[in-house]
Amino acid sequence: MSNSIIQSPDLGDVTGYLRDRIRTVPDWPQPGVMFRDITPLLQNPKTLRVLIDVFVHRYMDQNLDLVAGIDARGFILGSIIAYELNLGFVPIRKKGKLPFQTVAEEYELEYGSATVEIHADACKPGDRVLLIDDLIATGGTMMAGRKLLERLGATVVEGGAIVDLPELGGSKLLQASGLSLFTVCNFDGH
């Protein structure tokens, strides 16, 4: 995983610049959780451009076919990256949200389970796909998204996210499964 400092002549430490603009909301959605809110990155045109440029520069020469984004904030980031790279975008949705024939993958949550789905014709065998989400916590959602894409015959080149919460173990789990990861920054705790 790459959390190295990204440098820019205009901004200096781009990683720090973006990290400093992520809002921390204590005790949301439940007591003890420090929620990492990326909406300030999206609301400011300069930070949004810097954020997207970090991903575009990383992936512009990777010979990708598609970008897949995980419901819901992965849609925002993933679709813009796909547009900038002149690629198609594939939504990975929560169960029951896609209108056509789907393939589903269940994954475990802290208290129970959830399911994500992808259209059965979302990609074809051999497609090289970048998988995007806003944040890696336990890794369950990104792992499920990867499994869906691979079941359709695609190769997930890398998983990308803005934030990694390494103490929750998701990035370690994903890397142990063989998935290469890129995150812009990380935060301690959850």
Curated annotation (Swiss-Prot):
It catalyses: AMP + diphosphate = 5-phospho-alpha-D-ribose 1-diphosphate + adenine. It holds the Pfam family Pribosyltran. Coiled coil: none annotated. SUPFAM superfamilies: PRTase-like (SSF53271). It is found in: Cytoplasm. PROSITE patterns: PUR_PYR_PR_TRANSFER. Its EC number is 2.4.2.7. One of its GO terms (molecular function) is adenine phosphoribosyltransferase activity. Its main location: cytoplasm. GO terms for biological process: adenine salvage; AMP salvage; purine ribonucleoside salvage. Catalyzes a salvage reaction resulting in the formation of AMP, that is energically less costly than de novo synthesis. Belongs to the purine/pyrimidine phosphoribosyltransferase family. Homodimer. This is Adenine phosphoribosyltransferase.
